[in-house]
Design a protein with these regions (language model features):
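Predominantly a Rossmann-like dinucleotide-binding segment in NAD(P)-dependent oxidoreductases
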Residues: 116-201
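Beta-loop-alpha module in the N-terminal Rossmann-like domain of NAD(P)-dependent dehydrogenases
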Residues: 16, 42-102
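Hydrophobic residues in well-ordered beta-strands that form the structural core
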Residues: 85-86, 110-112, 247
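C-terminal helix-rich "cap/oligomerization" subdomain common to oxidoreductases
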Residues: 14, 26, 59-62, 216, ...
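Rossmann-fold dehydrogenase core element
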Residues: 98-115, 135-140
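Contiguous beta-strand/loop segments that form the cofactor/metal-binding neighborhood of enzyme cores
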Residues: 176-254, 291-306, 324, 339-348
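N-terminal Rossmann-like dinucleotide-binding module
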Residues: 1-40
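Active-site loop of classical SDR/Rossmann-like NAD(P)-dependent oxidoreductases
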Residues: 281-295, 310
Length: 348
């Protein structure tokens, strides 16, 4: 039987601990956090590195502030541990490539926490896309938002060098991952507007609007990722040649995103004239995502199953897309109109 060490024992570390206990494949040997909860029933280590260097620990869970993710993933792989790391994997695609070099050399399992792929409604949507029942995807439209309170400004999340970015890297990354998952193809053309009008925190965006296209397939998608959504929202629409799927709400621990309700056009629905009577509605009452992720991770550790969800290749895809979104925004010169006018004058 295997021993687990959990680095970071806040909300996510505790969610992972519960799922590990329920699964039963491994024991939790120790945990570390700067603020250990009073009711912690596990032995507490003195540091992250103590867990990573412990010869009795086989598996390390990294549930830490973002800036630890890359260096501690590399350190744990080099120490011969299997690693499960929360998102974001790092701050850039190049960071993920650096991690992959170490991963390949280590021969250990590395999996990233992209739990949204494991939600019941997403599972259903993916199976419908893959069945081609409604033909190919034409477009996808997505919105994901929450609000944060003033305390937010006092945490590591409000510092660019510690968080790496704002809402896109924190929450929007999940939606981008789902768009990539459902289409199965990367987006190579990106237009984006990134802003921090409300919290005005340097380098920490509170809103991102992005439109993306795969220039070969023509599949186009939009995402709005926001932390000024005063009433929390999750919405993902996928329209195909002969039907559609609309997911509103997401079953989460906070319960603030509403019921996870998936509306699907029935088989007999043909474009262009569908009405609400032609739909089936499915409500997903249980968030199975945490249990499912642990099950998949332990299957890879125990049986050598390839990492199918949350692999470093998928992490590289989503980080490449995030790089493109941030870069596109930077390349939009604020005085573009003046520059163009100057060019026109020079030409004439």
């Amino acid at each position: 039987s295997m021993n687990v060490g959990i680095c970071g024992f806040g909300k996510m570390g505790q969610i992972r601990a519960d799922a590990i206990e329920t699964h039963g494949f491994a024991q939790i040997k120790s945990v570390f956090d700067v603020n250990i909860p009073d009711n912690c029933k596990y032995p507490v280590a003195n540091s992250i590195d103590e867990i990573i260097e412990d010869p009795d620990i086989d598996i390390v869970f990294l549930c830490l502030p973002n800036y630890f993710n890359k260096p501690k993933t590399i350190m744990a792989l080099k120490a011969g541990k299997h690693v499960f790391c929360e998102k974001p994997p790092a701050f850039s695609a190049q960071d993920v490539r650096d991690i992959q070099e170490v991963e390949r050399a280590s021969g250990k399992v590395l999996m990233y926490g992209f739990n949204h792929r494991q939600h019941g409604a997403i599972d259903k949507m993916k199976s419908i896309v893959d069945s081609r029942k409604f033909g190919s995807i034409l477009w996808m439209r997505s919105r994901y938002g929450k609000s944060v309170d003033g305390d937010y400004l006092n945490t590591w999340r409000a510092k660019k060098e510690l968080a790496g970015g704002g809402i896109l890297l924190d929450q929007g990354i999940h939606m981008l991952d789902l768009l990539l998952y459902l289409t199965g193809k990367p987006f190579d053309e990106v237009h984006a507007m990134v802003s921090n009008m409300y919290w005005k925190t340097p380098g920490i965006e509170d809103n991102v609007f992005a439109i993306m296209r795969n220039t070969q397939t023509g599949v186009t998608a939009s995402v709005h990722s926001t932390m000024t959504q005063w009433r929390h929202l999750f919405s993902l629409e996928v329209f195909m040649e002969r039907g559609y799927m609309v997911l509103n709400g997401l079953k989460t621990s906070s319960g603030t995103y509403g019921d996870e309700i998936l509306t699907i056009a029935q088989n007999r629905t043909t474009a262009p004239a569908a009405t609400w009577e032609d739909e089936e509605r499915l409500t997903f009452h249980i968030d199975q995502s945490w249990a499912r992720e642990i099950e998949l991770f332990f299957d890879s550790v125990q049986n050598g199953a390839p990492v199918k969800f949350g692999s470093s290749d998928q992490a590289l895809e989503v980080m490449s897309l995030i790089d493109m979104i941030y870069e596109h925004d930077l390349h939009q010169a604020p005085n573009l109109a003046d520059q163009l006018n100057m060019t026109v004058k020079e030409l004439t």
